[in-house]
Design a protein with these regions (language model features):
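Membrane-aqueous junction of the first/signal-anchor transmembrane helix
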Residues: 1-172
Length: 172
């Protein structure tokens, strides 16, 4: 009978262990360099003591990674593939939100607000300029672009999507 050469087996196990350790080290190094943003967007009410309440479309993101970044652009899309329509939201720093560009370090939050105006004229203009349909509302996405080359995609909350659907229904 042939005997098993256990010395060769130990060499193979140590080689596989070394390869696994190198893979884990590369994964950890790569994840530390990645910028991660968490956020949401939707309809908000701003209520102040000395001023009337104001309705806004709000985009808020928080940097949850250790690497600092700068938010360079906020845009949106409607539709899919070749029927996709793109738009850019412009924000200037004012009393209700930050401007763009906005640097975000670890744990810092950025907040951008677009006033909806009287009778929600911002939503009315959005529906008219982009010829938004019910299908477009389902595919509406907000894209937050950073200086590190990353893009975070947010789905608008139900409250603002419902407002769009009401304006679409009233337009017909």
């Amino acid at each position: 009978m042939a005997e098993i050469a256990w010395g060769s087996f130990a060499d193979w196990v140590s080689g596989i262990g070394s390869l696994a350790a190198a893979g884990v080290a590369l994964y950890v190094a790569n994840s530390a360099q990645r910028v991660k943003l968490k956020g949401y967007c939707g309809h908000r009410l701003i209520i102040g003591l000395a001023q009337p309440q104001e309705e806004v479309f709000s985009v808020q993101v928080t940097n949850v990674s250790q690497r600092p970044t700068v938010v360079t652009n906020i845009g949106f899309t409607f539709g899919l593939w070749r029927w996709k329509r793109h738009g850019i939201l412009t924000f200037v720093q004012d009393d209700i939100g930050h401007g763009i560009p906005k640097p975000l370090s670890d744990g810092e939050t950025g907040n951008w607000n677009a006033r909806l105006g009287s009778d929600n004229c911002w939503i009315t203009n959005l529906v008219a300029q982009f010829s938004i349909t019910r299908f477009s509302v389902l595919t509406w996405r907000i894209h937050v672009h950073t200086s590190n080359g990353g893009t975070t995609t947010l789905r608008p909350e139900k409250n603002i999507r419902d407002m769009l659907l009401v304006h679409i229904a009233s337009r017909k």
